[in-house]
């Protein structure tokens, strides 16, 4: 086992050295800038089955890797070159954006979409507009589109942040690789949603099933200029190991729907990081990686006298699919290669007879944060239903999310005292107003038959409780709440099992408007989302200092930047806002009575037709008998 580096209280000399080190880090911090022309790239074929056009950057795919140090300032200028009349955006998943929520990238929450031909500069790490005492971030993240299903069509990439302060380096390893997992579709996802998912022909809400699963690798050492993708995908991809070396593997699931079980043949894994939170080393046989989740594991390479290669596995969780097509390869693998091992010589494959429940409460953060009694509790009940228009929608507390026209952040900063009234954000925004610095508990109850990974923007949360089945009397699958926890697991994306629950806690110390949603893309499309309006009494133009071009882009598209969800100074007038779906009414509604009456009339007409036909037929028979006589 590789132990974390333990640290004791430093004497005065150590404190002086630490202060000098911090000054040196500040002096050595770099400004990393990338320019992304977001455009369509033709004939991309990573699964070898079908070439298609995808959304890439600067004419290539996959998009660039962001590989930086924790003290760096990162700016990404995104230019919308899609040439389809559709807006774009980028969300840096897992970043906090303290006092810079307008860089979060969630369309209709923190910004308007980037108009065609225009640019938006995101300061994703250590923005000068953030306070000097902001919380440092390091670990494994990713950046992806947050508009119009565009990340499913390819606009997604790793974000790796390396610690550069010795006090933050808890583990030693020889090299660093990122393992990217993802599902892959052969059609534009917007078309799939329109034609196959949000459609009367799909009243049960069966999600579009991918054509393939992908594995590909990136070399992401802390020599930041060296970040590169390794060649090949899945069975054509190779991860190079050298005997005796220890590697950090950062596993990211960038799928729209698929979850993966990740494991290695012939090698042991120890989890050391979960979504930007270093944890005490925890041996695992496999990882259960839901959409948007990330883990880092340490793996020590073998030192065999007779070297051979080994398989790296990422098996798709078939429970995520309503129907598994016969031609879908669920079990995806790549190669761990060793020098001097014959190319076709492999060690025995590891076989998992079953996938046992993967408990993310088992991980213990290195930097402890105590569990604190919540000041406010919000319960969210997850459900899916066929609505009155014949389509299947998702909902929190029977409200299916409909985005506001005015970004919620701009409503919160412009509506004064009314900003604390959740009604102003729209009747279907699922807005929850939370007070500054309170401890918030979110209780999720999943009444759906499927698993759901939920992501909160702008925060880590503590996962303080999980149940696999809230109706069970078995404490092993429905345990009582453990009130004696001292350092609960923290992350930003949690999987809630079908029929199960999860309790999350976070400190409302980051004023802004933060999206909370299921990260399965079709479920977000169908309305499984809400907004946390955090400390609106703190927000103002002077607090945020929104760059003028951001609001100018809204106004150029005819979108207001002040007022309620439609730009009015009202808590009830939402004229022009798209209306949410309505539930099918039960009982004797007007339509039901009309339909029943129509059925009765149709039945009576049918009966009358039979009687009249029989009467005429009888007369004809009598006439024929008279003629025979």
UniProtKB/Swiss-Prot annotation:
The chain crosses the membrane at residues 592-612. Cu cation 4 binds at residues 452, 518, 523. Cu cation 3 binds at residues 146, 457, 517. Induction: Expression regulated by iron through the urbs1 transcription factor. Disruption phenotype: Strongly reduces virulence. GO terms for molecular function: copper ion binding; ferroxidase activity. Cu cation 1 binds at residues 91, 455. Residues 1-29 form the signal peptide. Iron transport multicopper oxidase, which is required for Fe(2+) high affinity uptake. May be required to oxidize Fe(2+) and release it from the transporter. Essential component of copper-dependent iron transport. This is Iron multicopper oxidase fer1. It comes from Mycosarcoma maydis.
């Amino acid at each position: 086992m590789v132990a974390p580096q333990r640290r004791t209280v430093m004497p005065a000399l150590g404190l002086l050295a630490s202060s000098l080190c911090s000054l040196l880090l500040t002096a050595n911090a770099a400004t990393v800038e990338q320019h992304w022309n977001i455009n369509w790239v033709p004939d991309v074929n990573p699964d070898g089955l079908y070439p298609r056009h995808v959304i890439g950057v600067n004419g290539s795919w996959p998009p660039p890797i962001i590989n930086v140090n924790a003290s760096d300032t990162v700016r990404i200028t995104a230019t919308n070159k899609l040439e389809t009349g559709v807006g774009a955006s980028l969300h840096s998943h897992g970043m906090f954006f303290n006092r810079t929520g307008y860089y979060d990238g969630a369309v209709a929450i923190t910004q308007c979409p980037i108009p065609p031909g225009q640019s938006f500069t995101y300061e994703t790490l250590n923005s000068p507009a953030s306070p000097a005492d902001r919380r440092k971030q390091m670990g494994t993240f990713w950046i992806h589109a947050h508009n119009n299903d565009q990340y499913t069509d390819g606009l997604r990439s790793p974000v790796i942040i390396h610690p550069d302060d010795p006090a933050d380096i808890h583990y030693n390893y020889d090299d660093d690789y990122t393992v990217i997992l993802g599902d892959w579709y052969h059609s534009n996802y917007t078309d799939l949603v329109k034609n196959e998912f949000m459609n009367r022909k799909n009243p049960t809400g069966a999600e579009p099933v991918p054509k393939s699963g992908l594995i590909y690798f990136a070399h992401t050492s802390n020599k930041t200029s060296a970040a590169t993708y390794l060649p090949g995908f899945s069975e054509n991809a190779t991860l190079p190991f050298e005997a005796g070396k220890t590697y950090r593997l950062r596993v990211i699931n960038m799928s729209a729907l698929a979850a993966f079980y990740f494991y290695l043949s012939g090698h042991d894994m120890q989890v050391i990081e979960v979504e930007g939170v270093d944890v005490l080393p925890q041996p695992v046989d496999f990882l259960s990686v839901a959409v948007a989740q990330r883990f880092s594991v340490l793996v020590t390479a073998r030192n065999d006298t007779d070297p051979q290669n080994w398989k790296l596995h990422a098996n798709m969780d078939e429970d995520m699919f309503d129907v598994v097509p016969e031609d879908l390869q669920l079990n995806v693998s790549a190669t761990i290669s060793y020098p001097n091992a014959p190319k076709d010589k492999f060690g025995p494959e590891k076989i998992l007879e079953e996938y046992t429940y993967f408990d993310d409460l088992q991980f213990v953060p290195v930097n402890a944060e105590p569990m604190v009694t919540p000041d406010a509790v919000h319960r969210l009940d997850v459900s899916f239903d066929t609505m009155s228009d014949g389509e299947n929608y998702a909902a929190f507390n029977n409200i299916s999310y409909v985005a506001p026209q005015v970004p919620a952040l701009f409503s919160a900063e412009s509506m004064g005292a009314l900003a604390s009234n959740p009604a102003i954000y729209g009747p279907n925004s699922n807005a929850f107003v939370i007070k500054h610095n309170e401890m918030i508990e979110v209780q999720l109850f999943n009444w759906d038959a499927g698993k759901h990974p939920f992501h909160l923007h702008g925060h880590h949360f503590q996962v303080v409780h999980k149940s696999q089945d809230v109706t069970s009397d078995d404490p092993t699958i429905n345990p009582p709440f453990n009130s004696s926890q001292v350092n609960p697991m923290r992350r930003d994306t949690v999987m809630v099992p079908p029929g199960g629950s999860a309790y999350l806690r976070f400190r409302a110390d980051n004023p802004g408007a933060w999206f909370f949603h299921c990260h399965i893309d079709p479920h977000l499309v169908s309305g499984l989302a809400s907004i946390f309006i955090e400390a609106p009494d703190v927000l103002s133009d002077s607090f945020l200092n929104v760059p003028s071009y951001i609001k100018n882009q809204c106004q150029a598209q005819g979108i207001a930047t002040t007022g309620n969800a439609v730009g009015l100074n009202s808590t009830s007038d939402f004229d022009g806002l798209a209306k949410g779906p309505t539930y099918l009414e039960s009982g004797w509604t007007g339509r039901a009575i009309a339909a029943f009456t129509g059925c009765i009339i149709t039945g009576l007409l049918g009966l009358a037709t039979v009687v009249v036909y029989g009467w005429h037929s009888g007369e004809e028979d009598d006439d024929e008998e008279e003629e025979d006589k």
